[in-house]
Amino acid sequence: MSGAIFGPLEGPSSLDAPSIHPLVCPLCHVQYERPCLLDCFHDFCAGCLRGRATDGRLTCPLCQHQTVLKGPSGLPPVDRLLQFLVDSSGDGVEAVRCANCDLECSEQDVETTYFCNTCGQPLCARCRDETHRARMFARHDIVALGQRSRDVPQKCTLHAEPYLLFSTDKKLLLCIRCFRDMQKESRAHCVDLESAYVQGCERLEQAVLAVKALQTATREAIALLQAMVEEVRHSAAEEEDAIHALFGSMQDRLAERKALLLQAVQSQYEEKDKAFKEQLSHLATLLPTLQVHLVICSSFLSLANKAEFLDLGYELMERLQGIVTRPHHLRPIQSSKIASDHRAEFARCLEPLLLLGPRRVAAAASGANTLAGGLGPKALTGPHCPSPVGKMSGSPVQKPTLHRSISTKVLLAEGENTPFAEHCRHYEDSYRHLQAEMQSLKDQVQELHRDLTKHHSLIKAEIMGDVLHKSLQLDVQIASEHASLEGMRVVFQEIWEEAYQRVANEQEIYEAQLHDLLQLRQENAYLTTITKQITPYVRSIAKVKERLEPRFQAPVDEQSESLQNTHDDSRNNAASARNNPGSVPEKREKTSEPKGNSWAPNGLSEEPLLKNMDHHRSKQKNGGDVPTWREHPT
C-alpha cells in the first residue's frame, strides 16, 4: 500500500469531515486488533503493519514519518493504552469462564452470568446457587456480569495482595509487601491511591488543555493557509489581468514577453500553491491525530478505574506531551504575493520603441525590484529564453555598503545645497546623537552585567528600571527617525528620477542609513532583553543584601569620606603654608644652617602630619568627630 489514506484536499470542506473512530484502524477500517504505536503517535493493527518494515525502519502510512524498530519482531510496541480501551469497549467483550466449573459463557449468556465482587470471580447460574448458598457467603456482593463493579481492588502480581499505594517516582502500583520491600528513601514518594488519582487527574487535565490549545492553533493555521491559497489564486488572477491589460496596448512588440511573464507567474503560482498545500496536508494529518487523542483521553477517563488510570494515565500524559512538543509548522513558510516585475520587463522590451535611455530603464528596473522583493530577474529567467534583466544585476543600488560614512563625507564636502545634502547633514547629527546614547547604554549595561556576575555587587532596582526606560525611549526615537526617513523616500525618488547620475551614490548612502538604524534598533532590542533578564536577579540580590547586611554600606562610606577630608585638609594646609609670607625669613635662616641639618625641616613638617593622622585614627575609633582643620606647630 502506498499509505496515501488522506487523499489530496479538494477544498475547505474536506477538513470538516467527521473524524475516524478512535478504536478503528485507518488501514483495515475495523476495530483494532493488537494496536501498535508509531513514533508519530499513529496507531495501526499489528497485522496491517507486518511486512512493511525496511532496514529496521517503518514508514507511517499516514504522515510518512519513519519509526526505528527495536527487536526482532519487526513491529512497533503494542499500544497498551489503546488496547485497554479496546478491551474495555462494548464490542470487545471476551468469553467468560465460570471460576467453579470452567463453563464458558458466550456474549448471549452475559445477562445470565454473574460476578461476585467480594470474591472477584465470575460464576454461572448453577454455581451461584450451589457455591454461595451457605450462610458464610450471605454477605457476598453478587451482581450480573455486565453490572460488575469496576472499582474491584486489583491484586499485586508478585504478592497477591491488593494495591494500596502508588509510587509517584517510579509510577508503579504497590501493595503493602511491595511497600515494605522498598528502600526508605523511595517510601517518601508513595501516596495513597485516592491522592495519586487526584494528582494524576490534574496533570492529565493540564495535558488535555495543552492539546486543545494546539488543536485550536492548528485549526487557525489551516484556516489561514486556506485563505492564503485563495489569496494566491486571486493574486495570480490580478497579476495576469494587469499583464493582459498592458499587453493589449503593445501587442505587436510584446508577444514573446507576454508568454514569458505568464510563464513566470504560473511558475510562482505552482510553487507557492504546492508549498501551501503540502503544509496544509501536513496539518490535515495532524488534526485527526489531535482529535483521536482527545477522544482517547475522554474514553480513558470514563472507562478506567483508579488503578487502571494510574497504570496507564502517565503513559497517556507522556504521549500527549510528546504530541505537543513535536515541531509543528503552523505559520506559512512564504508569502502569498505573486509579482512578475512586468513593468520593468515591458519597459526593457519597449526601449527601442520608446527611445528610453539605459540608465532610465535601469532606474525603473531597480525600483521595480525594490517593490517586488527582488523576485523579478530570477522569476523571469526561462530555460530557452534568458531574460535581459539579468544584465541589470550589476546595478549600484543593491544593498547598503560599509562605506556610508565615507560616502556621506564626500557628498557633504562638495558643498552643494541639494535637498539630499541637507537631509544628510540633519541625519548625521541625529544619528550621532542616537549612536552616543546607544554607546552610553551599552557601557552602562556592560558595567552592570560585570558588577552582577563578576563582582557580585549590590545593584539597585531603580538603576535597572532607569536603563530599561532609557532603552524604550531610545527605541521610540529610533522608530520615529526611521519612520521620518522612510517617509522621505517618495521625495527623494522624484529627485533620483531627474538626476540619476548622482542618485546611485545617494541611494547607497540612504539604504546604509536605514540599515544602521535597524542595526541600532536590533542592538537596542538585545540590550532591552538583557536588561529584562538581569532585573529579576538584581531585585532578588538586593532583597537578600538588605536582609542580611542592612548597614553594610554606611560605615565604609563614612570612613572613606573622613579619609578624603583628612587628605584634602593636609593639602590645603600645605598650600597655605607655602603662600604665607611670614615663613620666608624662617626659611632663609634655615638655609644658612649647615648642610648636614638640611633634613630637619622635612622632618618637622612631616612629624605633625603623622601625629595628626594618628590623632584622627584614635578619634575615629573612639567615635569622635573628625576635625576639618589642623593646627601646625610653630
UniProtKB/Swiss-Prot annotation:
<dbReference type="GO" id="GO:0008270">
    <property type="term" value="F:zinc ion binding"/>
</dbReference>
<feature type="zinc finger region" description="B box-type; atypical">
    <location>
        <begin position="93"/>
        <end position="145"/>
    </location>
</feature>
<dbReference type="InterPro" id="IPR039320">
    <property type="entry name" value="RNF207"/>
</dbReference>
<dbReference type="GO" id="GO:1901207">
    <property type="term" value="P:regulation of heart looping"/>
</dbReference>
<comment type="function">
    <text>Plays a role in cardiac repolarization possibly by stabilizing membrane expression of the potassium channel KCNH2/HERG, or by assisting its synthesis, folding or export from the endoplasmic reticulum, in a heat shock protein-dependent manner.</text>
</comment>
<dbReference type="GO" id="GO:0030544">
    <property type="term" value="F:Hsp70 protein binding"/>
</dbReference>
<dbReference type="Pfam" id="PF00097">
    <property type="entry name" value="zf-C3HC4"/>
</dbReference>
<dbReference type="InterPro" id="IPR000315">
    <property type="entry name" value="Znf_B-box"/>
</dbReference>
<keyword id="KW-0963">Cytoplasm</keyword>
<dbReference type="GO" id="GO:0010628">
    <property type="term" value="P:positive regulation of gene expression"/>
</dbReference>
<feature type="coiled-coil region">
    <location>
        <begin position="422"/>
        <end position="457"/>
    </location>
</feature>
<dbReference type="GO" id="GO:1905026">
    <property type="term" value="P:positive regulation of membrane repolarization during ventricular cardiac muscle cell action potential"/>
</dbReference>
<feature type="binding site">
    <location>
        <position position="101"/>
    </location>
    <ligand>
        <name>Zn(2+)</name>
    </ligand>
</feature>
<protein>
    <recommendedName>
        <fullName>RING finger protein 207</fullName>
    </recommendedName>
</protein>
<feature type="binding site">
    <location>
        <position position="132"/>
    </location>
    <ligand>
        <name>Zn(2+)</name>
    </ligand>
</feature>
<feature type="binding site">
    <location>
        <position position="127"/>
    </location>
    <ligand>
        <name>Zn(2+)</name>
    </ligand>
</feature>
<dbReference type="Pfam" id="PF00643">
    <property type="entry name" value="zf-B_box"/>
</dbReference>
<dbReference type="InterPro" id="IPR017907">
    <property type="entry name" value="Znf_RING_CS"/>
</dbReference>
<keyword id="KW-0863">Zinc-finger</keyword>
<dbReference type="Pfam" id="PF12126">
    <property type="entry name" value="PML_CC"/>
</dbReference>
<dbReference type="GO" id="GO:0048471">
    <property type="term" value="C:perinuclear region of cytoplasm"/>
</dbReference>
<keyword id="KW-0862">Zinc</keyword>
<dbReference type="GO" id="GO:0051087">
    <property type="term" value="F:protein-folding chaperone binding"/>
</dbReference>
<comment type="subunit">
    <text>Interacts with the core-glycosylated, but not the fully glycosylated form of KCNH2/HERG. Interacts with DNAJA1 and HSPA8. Interacts (via the C-terminus) with HSPA1A; this interaction additively increases KCNH2 expression.</text>
</comment>
<dbReference type="InterPro" id="IPR018957">
    <property type="entry name" value="Znf_C3HC4_RING-type"/>
</dbReference>
<dbReference type="GO" id="GO:0044325">
    <property type="term" value="F:transmembrane transporter binding"/>
</dbReference>
<dbReference type="InterPro" id="IPR013083">
    <property type="entry name" value="Znf_RING/FYVE/PHD"/>
</dbReference>
<keyword id="KW-0479">Metal-binding</keyword>
<keyword id="KW-0175">Coiled coil</keyword>
<feature type="binding site">
    <location>
        <position position="98"/>
    </location>
    <ligand>
        <name>Zn(2+)</name>
    </ligand>
</feature>
<feature type="coiled-coil region">
    <location>
        <begin position="494"/>
        <end position="518"/>
    </location>
</feature>
<feature type="region of interest" description="Disordered">
    <location>
        <begin position="552"/>
        <end position="634"/>
    </location>
</feature>
<dbReference type="GO" id="GO:1905033">
    <property type="term" value="P:positive regulation of membrane repolarization during cardiac muscle cell action potential"/>
</dbReference>
<dbReference type="InterPro" id="IPR021978">
    <property type="entry name" value="PML-like_CC"/>
</dbReference>
<dbReference type="InterPro" id="IPR001841">
    <property type="entry name" value="Znf_RING"/>
</dbReference>
<dbReference type="GO" id="GO:0055117">
    <property type="term" value="P:regulation of cardiac muscle contraction"/>
</dbReference>
<feature type="zinc finger region" description="RING-type">
    <location>
        <begin position="25"/>
        <end position="64"/>
    </location>
</feature>
